[in-house]
Amino acid sequence: MDRRTSLYLYAWRNHIDVDYFPMQTAEAFSVPIGGTCAIALDPTKIRSEADEAVKLSHELGHCVYGGFYNKYTPFDVRAQHENKANAWAVYRLIPWGKLKQAVKNGITEVWELAEYFDVTEDFMRWAIAYYTERKNYKFE
């Protein structure tokens, strides 16, 4: 089963609706609804299968840990919610052990790693920084 299919299956198994429709500015978003969650993706703003997987897994991250921010409260930190959603997506799409093994096998350029894991280059950069700077993991 390919990565995108497994993400959609994960959403289905967890009663998370995923819908597609054009949006003015957003590329994707998720909202809590009745004890579960719904995700919207703008199909006109999906640039590749890798981009779709990154966007979907990020929004699933919001749904899984319940990280939704409220612009009307001063106590809500948007960056914190975004980082948690990205971290969930990283663990799902680029597990540390597999990333470390890929590097050990000689796949060292960001574009090569992004291609290997079928994610965007920007997301791969975020994942590498997350593992090496925040988690202090080493490639040795």
Regions found by a protein language model. Give the residues of each.
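Active-site hotspot residues in diverse enzymes, especially metal/ion-binding acidic/histidine motifs
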Residues: 1-140
